[in-house]
Structure formats: structure tokens, C-alpha cells
């Protein structure tokens, strides 16, 4: 059921599209996240990787919108797709409300996927064919023989959320973009201050409750991690994508066994402080600590709402991935934001990117 009015008929993410200026950069990353290649495009150098209900489109097609995006930004998420009830209707409405169209070249007998210009100029596709047997993949792709079409992989189920890092002063622009076109609402607002720098984050959620996009911008001090991302990425873009698991410890063990590299674990003090922060949380602290998994949420008055999360290292330029499990908490790990922000800041100081004068 929709949380509020859903004029575009949104129904979750359909896929994220990735591209790289150098060949064979992304395939190994998909593999260490537990994804399997299940299909190849009929006429283009484009491939479908899957795990659970997550679709990753690897676009290696030369002279494509994706290849130009990757040439400018490096290996990156160069597009994303929302599921909608009626793509032509949604597309028409988006254009009437001021969205810019993006033309994607199609071959004969191929679907024309309507797309508008999204974050960093990347296409935001509107897809209404996602039923098993009649999806865009059934029409435009050839499934590989003998490969499970819905591999379980490391137990990742769906795209939980993805973030946009934006230039200072542009958070309101992007919030308005999603509000005006899709009727997103702001569900969380954070102002995270580290010792030297800070960031502001506005978490936007679609009326279907399934598409969640936190927008991040640098606070007035500058020189922090959002600024560093924007410099490295050469513009605004998707900073990380979070995948949902229903057993993060098990997922972590699987990912670790296939070569996933995780962000440096928080200091021991983080785990010593957990009981004080979340009294009677009931999670196995030793197991979490051994894996560097973070815990957040609230546990007041016996009403436990928890969230477990862990991040990969930066795997594509400054872009990384998050693996998350929700036990009643629908936030983004705000309690960990500060803890993590400070640990990233310490890392920036160590690397000499940030001066402590």
C-alpha cells in the first residue's frame, strides 16, 4: 500500500545501470558481491547480473549514453530505473512537469525505454514491464543456458536505498526534483558534524515506500568527504547503493568467502559503547565485532527497532556499496553516521587530505 499519493504509480527500483571507461573493471566487483551474469542483450554489449530481486545492468556499449557518462566520471552507476504502472503516462507527466528527456538509441525490434535526465545527467528510466516472462529482459536479452535466472548469491534481496552526493546548495534542487515529479517526501533530515567538517543529509522516500534516496551535501566548512567525492567523481552522482539482506551475519560470511573487501571496522570502543547506546538490544556483539558490522536503531521501553549495516571499501573510484538488515528500523543508521563520519575523518587526516590546523 502506498504511504501517500503516488501520481507516477511507482513500485520500487527495477535496475541500476553501471559502466566503466576501462573494460573488465566492473565484472569482478559484481562477482565479489555475489551477483551472477544471467543474460546478454540481443544486439548491444550490455549484460544483466542478478541476485535475489536485484538487477544490475552492465553497459559496455561504445558511443552510448553510459559510455559517455563513464568517460566523464569513471566506473560508476550511470543510470537507474524506477518501476511505474504506465511508463508512457509517467514519462509524459514528467516532461509536462519540466523533466528533460534523454534519448537512448534502440535497435530494430527493441523496446524503447523512456528516460529522463537524473542526477549528474544520468538517465532515470521509467519501466512498466517487469512481470516474469514479459519483462524488458525477456524481450531485449537472451538468458544464458543452464544459469539460474534468480540466483540467491550472498542472500541480498533488493535495492534498499541509494544516495546522491550533490554540490553545496543543491540539496534543495534535487529534493524538489523528486518531490515535484514523483511526490517523494523528506522522511529524515540529519546534520552530521565531525570534529573538522560536516555534512547535511535529506532522506527522500517515494510514495511506494520502496524507493529511498538520501541526498548529501557538504556543510559550510568544506573540504570534507562529500567535497572529496565530488572532486574525484567529477560531479554529482550516486555515492553508494545499499542492498538488503535478511541475515547480515550470514551474508557477510558469504561475501567475505568470495573476496569482498569491507571498510575498516570501527574501533573497539564502538562496540563497548553499544549497550549504553542501545540497552538490551540482544544482538551478538562478539559476532558483530568480529565482522565490523554496525548496529543502530532504538531499544527504549522494550520496543526494539534495529538495523545492522556494513559498507564495502570504495570499489569503483569513490563509489562503495552497503549491505543492510532491518529489524523494524527504517532509518539509514543515523546513530552510526556520526561514529562513521568521525572514522572516515580520521582516515582523511591520516591520508593528509584533511588538515587539523
UniProtKB/Swiss-Prot annotation:
Cofactor(s) it depends on: Fe cation
GO biological process per UniProt: L-phenylalanine catabolic process; tyrosine catabolic process
Entry GO MF terms: 4-hydroxyphenylpyruvate dioxygenase activity; metal ion binding
Superkingdom of source: Bacteria
Cross-referenced Pfam families: Glyoxalase, Glyoxalase_5
Transmembrane segments: none
EC number: 1.13.11.27
VOC domain ranges (all copies): 12-129, 158-313
Pathway: Amino-acid degradation; L-phenylalanine degradation; acetoacetate and fumarate from L-phenylalanine: step 3/6
Residues at which Fe cation binds: 161, 240, 322
PROSITE patterns cross-referenced by the UniProt entry: VOC
Protein name per UniProt: 4-hydroxyphenylpyruvate dioxygenase
Biological source species: Pseudomonas sp. (strain P.J. 874)
Lineage: Bacteria, Pseudomonadati, Pseudomonadota
Amino acid at each position: 500500500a502506498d504511504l501517500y499519493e503516488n501520481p507516477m504509480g511507482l513500485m520500487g527500483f527495477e535496475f541500476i545501470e553501471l559502466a566503466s571507461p576501462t573494460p573488465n573493471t566492473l565484472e569482478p566487483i559484481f562477482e565479489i558481491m555475489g551477483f551472477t551474469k544471467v543474460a546478454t542483450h540481443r544486439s548491444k554489449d550490455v549484460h544483466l547480473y542478478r541476485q535475489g530481486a536485484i538487477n544490475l545492468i552492465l553497459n559496455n556499449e561504445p558511443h552510448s549514453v553510459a559510455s559517455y557518462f563513464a568517460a566523464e566520471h569513471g566506473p560508476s552507476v550511470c543510470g537507474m530505473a524506477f518501476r511505474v504502472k504506465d511508463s508512457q503516462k509517467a514519462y509524459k507527466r514528467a516532461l509536462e512537469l519540466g523533466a528533460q528527456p534523454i534519448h537512448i538509441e534502440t535497435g530494430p525490434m527493441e523496446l524503447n525505454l523512456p528516460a529522463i535526465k537524473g542526477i549528474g545527467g544520468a538517465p532515470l528510466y521509467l519501466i512498466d514491464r517487469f512481470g516474469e516472462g514479459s519483462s524488458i529482459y525477456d524481450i531485449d536479452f537472451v538468458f544464458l543456458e543452464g544459469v539460474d535466472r534468480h540466483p540467491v548469491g550472498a542472500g541480498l534481496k533488493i535495492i534498499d536505498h541509494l544516495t546522491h552526493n550533490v554540490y553545496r546548495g543543491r540539496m534543495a534542487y534535487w529534493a524538489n526534483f523528486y518531490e515535484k515529479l514523483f511526490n517523494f517526501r523528506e522522511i529524515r533530515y540529519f546534520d552530521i558534524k565531525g570534529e573538522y567538517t560536516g555534512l547535511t543529509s535529506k532522506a527522500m522516500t517515494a510514495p511506494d515506500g520502496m524507493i529511498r534516496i538520501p541526498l548529501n551535501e557538504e556543510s559550510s566548512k568544506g573540504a570534507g568527504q562529500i567535497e572529496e567525492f565530488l572532486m574525484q567523481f567529477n560531479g554529482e552522482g550516486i555515492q553508494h547503493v545499499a542492498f538488503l539482506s535478511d541475515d547480515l551475519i550470514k551474508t557477510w560470511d558469504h561475501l567475505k568467502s568470495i573476496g569482498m573487501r569491507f571498510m575498516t571496522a570501527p574501533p573497539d570502543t564502538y562496540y563497548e559503547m553499544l549497550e549504553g547506546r542501545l540497552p538490551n538490544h540482544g544482538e551478538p556483539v562478539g559476532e558483530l565485532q568480529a565482522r565490523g558490522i554496525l548496529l543502530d536503531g532504538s531499544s527504549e521501553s522494550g520496543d526494539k527497532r534495529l538495523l545492522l549495516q556494513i559498507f564495502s571499501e570504495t570499489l569503483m573510484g569513490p563509489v562503495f556499496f552497503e549491505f543492510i538488515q532491518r529489524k523494524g528500523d527504517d532509518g539509514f543508521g543515523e546513530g552510526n553516521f556520526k561514529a562513521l563520519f568521525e572514522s572516515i575523518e580520521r582516515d582523511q587526516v591520516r591520508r593528509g587530505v584533511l588538515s587539523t590546523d
